[in-house]
Design a protein with these regions (language model features):
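Non-catalytic alpha-helical scaffolds and adjoining flexible linkers that form interface surfaces
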Residues: 1-145
Length: 145
C-alpha cells in the first residue's frame, strides 16, 4: 500500500550502514515510524527530506508491516533555526514533546499545526526563544488533555 503525505521528521536514528529509522508526524496518519533506506548514502534522493525537523512531501509504502520512505521532497527545512544552537535545541525539544503527546496512527492536526507554527516562529519571526517555548508548552496542554 502506498501513501502520499506531508510529514515532519520528529526523530531520526541511524540504522545499519546507510539507513535511518524515522519518527514522522503526518497530516493523515498521525505519528508513524518509517525506515529511510539508503538515506545516509551520499547523493541519496531522499536524504534531504529525511533530516530532523524537515517538513517534506513523502511517498511511503508498507513493506512487511512497516512503512518505508520511497520519495521525499523538502517543503520547508527551517534553515534559519539550524544556524542558532538555542533555537535548534528548542525545536528539538518541541519535536520531543510532540512525539510524547502524539499517538501512533491517530491523526492530530492541532498538534502538528502547533509544532509547525512554533518552528516557523523560531525560524523567521524575531521573537525571544523563551517566549516561543512558553507559548508552545501552554498550547500543548489542550491536545494533551
Amino acid at each position: 500500500m502506498h501513501m502520499r503525505t506531508k510529514a515532519l521528521v520528529l526523530r531520526e536514528t541511524a540504522y545499519k550502514e546507510s539507513d535511518k529509522i524515522l519518527t514522522l508526524l503526518t497530516q493523515e496518519a498521525g505519528k508513524l515510524t518509517a525506515s529511510g533506506r539508503g538515506c545516509r548514502k551520499k547523493g541519496s534522493p531522499i536524504a534531504a527530506g529525511c533530516q530532523l525537523l524537515v517538513w517534506s512531501d513523502m511517498v511511503l509504502y508498507e513493506h512487511r508491516g512497516r512503512w518505508a520512505v520511497q520519495e521525499a521532497a523538502v517543503e520547508r527545512e527551517f534553515r534559519g533555526m539550524r544556524d542558532d544552537l538555542v533555537k535548534f535545541a528548542l525545536g528539538c525539544y518541541g519535536a520531543e514533546v510532540t512525539e510524547l503527546l502524539a499517538v501512533e496512527g491517530v491523526p492530530n492536526p492541532e498538534l502538528l499545526s502547533l509544532l509547525l507554527n512554533s518552528l516557523h516562529a523560531l525560524d523567521k519571526l524575531d521573537r525571544p526563544p523563551a517566549l516561543v517555548k512558553a507559548a508552545f508548552e501552554l498550547r500543548c496542554l489542550c491536545p494533551a488533555g
